[in-house]
Amino acid sequence: MNIKPFGDRVVIKKVEAEEKTASGIVLPGAAKEQPQIAEVVEVGPGGIVEGKEIKMELTVGDKVIFQKYSGTEVKIEGQEYTILRQSDVLAVIE
């Protein structure tokens, strides 16, 4: 992949949703809930947002939980990614 986000943005790749429920029911593609867990694949340099300096706290490889419906989805070389602001990330999974 060759994409470099500007400012306080990060590029994430969503983790695949579960194919089965906890009780063993297989879900068709449309019934799967969109995952809110992703892996950070690129990080912008940070910058000034609304007059405040934003330092990047995320690093490539972090597993994160992000806000639903945030960011912009893009497809590059057949892979789907989401570009969003660092502030749309709710937590890092350790």
Curated annotation (Swiss-Prot):
Together with the chaperonin GroEL, plays an essential role in assisting protein folding. The GroEL-GroES system forms a nano-cage that allows encapsulation of the non-native substrate proteins and provides a physical environment optimized to promote and accelerate protein folding. GroES binds to the apical surface of the GroEL ring, thereby capping the opening of the GroEL channel. Heptamer of 7 subunits arranged in a ring. Interacts with the chaperonin GroEL. Keywords: Chaperone, Cytoplasm. It holds the Pfam family Cpn10. SUPFAM superfamilies: GroES-like. It is found in: Cytoplasm. GO terms for molecular function: ATP binding; metal ion binding; protein folding chaperone; protein-folding chaperone binding; unfolded protein binding. One of its GO terms (cellular component) is cytoplasm. This is Co-chaperonin GroES. HAMAP family: CH10. Its main location: cytoplasm. InterPro entries: Chaperonin_GroES, Chaperonin_GroES_sf, GroES-like_sf. One of its GO terms (biological process) is chaperone cofactor-dependent protein refolding. It comes from Clostridioides difficile. Belongs to the GroES chaperonin family.
